[in-house]
């Protein structure tokens, strides 16, 4: 390792590899952490093999997500045997959820940090280098990492977290336990970030929040509808997306702004979880099946051609076959463009874990999930097939995995498109004629 001078103190430079699991917020957090560490003289590497320090930025939303982390830590044990000086840190939602128990769940962890404590990472890493294990799980009522310029991982699309945490208490969800209560960034700081990204040539900006519609800057009397409108005006010509919305919070005024601003993408992710009002009540979702239908009708009447995606859970506590059929019938009626689909797994500490019996056998959960996946695959296939022959505008994001002669990108409605390169590069906006489709992808050629 090389030596540098930092703050008049001689330090050894360390190469850091961060592996990010889970959601877009975790990806945005990794960019913030990278900036914090680079400011302290650490050097980032894209290879675990070249790293002196490996940080796992983790997700706890489902049981299998935690199992992935534990499997990775087991893999790291072998690395440490051959490289005794290697440090390993686990940060994010898993250590925040399990706290000090995490040290006993896997060997060889040098430090643990929750999502509100990333400013403490340089000190924790320095202690770990001296053989001192550390953990910090403090929640903050105001930490939004405002003022830190993230080390962006790309040059085309960028994330801006505008709020953190969640005040909803859905019965199945760990987010309030791992991300804390809602707090929002000042709207002026968001607009400053947007301005910098637009001036730097970014083509797409996604506003992030665990419950983004709850954004509120009380001092500026600015809610999410106002923020989204101001962002769209400040970054005219840049695609604007946002996620994730709660059905009970999405408003007619917000939908009108999306319809009015050409650069706000016509794609809304609106998790419903179940099509049964009884299950929605058990889940503490705050709305009924009928109210969700009303939201969908309002959105589609205001925004022609909008795509709507969702999240669905199979086999939640007490779910009957009738409840499951209600989910399938909702899917048939709404015809989601795509969906994230899972079967229920108990998360300790949640209301469901404490008060509701996990009484649907795992095999039955899997069977119901298979039905949901099959139906959504059919619906997605039909909706994509309807695009064949159309000319759509695609923001090229990267070279296609299929061939170096093809690019991959997305429409403003968030449909994935693979198309013949024809001299175009990532970052270009390309008019593409759709020739064929699959349930997941549109295939075309420049028009």
UniProtKB/Swiss-Prot annotation:
Its cofactor is [4Fe-4S] cluster. Its EC number is 2.8.4.3. Residues 385-447 form the TRAM domain. Residues 14-130 form the MTTase N-terminal domain. It catalyses: N(6)-dimethylallyladenosine(37) in tRNA + (sulfur carrier)-SH + AH2 + 2 S-adenosyl-L-methionine = 2-methylsulfanyl-N(6)-dimethylallyladenosine(37) in tRNA + (sulfur carrier)-H + 5'-deoxyadenosine + L-methionine + A + S-adenosyl-L-homocysteine + 2 H(+). It holds the Pfam family TRAM. [4Fe-4S] cluster 1 binds at residues 23, 59, 93. Binds 2 [4Fe-4S] clusters. One cluster is coordinated with 3 cysteines and an exchangeable S-adenosyl-L-methionine. It is found in: Cytoplasm. Gene3D superfamilies: Methylthiotransferase, N-terminal domain, tm_1862 like domain. Keywords: 4Fe-4S, Cytoplasm, Iron, Iron-sulfur, Metal-binding, S-adenosyl-L-methionine, Transferase, tRNA processing. [4Fe-4S] cluster 2 binds at residues 166, 170, 173. The keyword 4Fe-4S applies. GO terms for cellular component: cytosol. Residues 152-382 form the Radical SAM core domain. One of its GO terms (molecular function) is N6-isopentenyladenosine methylthiotransferase activity. Monomer. Catalyzes the methylthiolation of N6-(dimethylallyl)adenosine (i(6)A), leading to the formation of 2-methylthio-N6-(dimethylallyl)adenosine (ms(2)i(6)A) at position 37 in tRNAs that read codons beginning with uridine. PANTHER family: CDK5 REGULATORY SUBUNIT-ASSOCIATED PROTEIN 1, MITOCHONDRIAL TRNA METHYLTHIOTRANSFERASE CDK5RAP1. Belongs to the methylthiotransferase family. MiaB subfamily. This is tRNA-2-methylthio-N(6)-dimethylallyladenosine synthase.
